[in-house]
Amino acid sequence: MENRIVRFSKHGGPEVLEIVKESVNEPQEDEVRIQVKALGLNQAEVMLREGRYVASPNFPSRIGIEASGIIDAIGSNVSSCKIGDSVCAIPFLSWDENDYWTADSINKYGVYGDTAIVPAWTISKKVSNQSFEEAAAAWCQYLTAWGGLVYNSNIENRNCCIFTGASSSAAIGGMQIVK
């Protein structure tokens, strides 16, 4: 069985992205394989592709940091989900000691493809009344805002937070977090 994936072998614009075929791999013991139904497009991916992200991939590299789909294989240590579950995946949550998305996780866990293998701890069950498209696009803005507001700034209940511009998805997510 073949899997179409998107990868790139050098930094640049969208023209560096290429669709290649590879064999479908089996997940390792703590991973799941997802039949990708939808994926999110993110500014972080553009920055990664253009060479402006805090981490740089090892080439050739896969790409894609959020997706939704249906689990079709699970590793031997995975008990939190089962084959057939509809899930969201956010595999870019594999961090290094500086809390940056690691080059290894970028190369290994990109979700642009027919299937994607991701660590089981980076998936969440899809909300039943959400479409796959909605589920794939609902994560990064909130995680970006949470990282800045909660993880890095330690904002707590009753703290004051001012948004000088709230038109981006991350700012809208941030406003919902601090309510």
Whereabouts are the PLM-identified features?
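Cytochrome P450 core scaffold surrounding the K-helix E-X-X-R motif
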Residues: A44-E50
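Short, Lys/Arg- and Gly-enriched loop/turn segments at beta-strand edges
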Residues: S94-D104
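A structural motif shared across PLP-dependent enzymes of the aminotransferase-like
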Residues: I106-A120
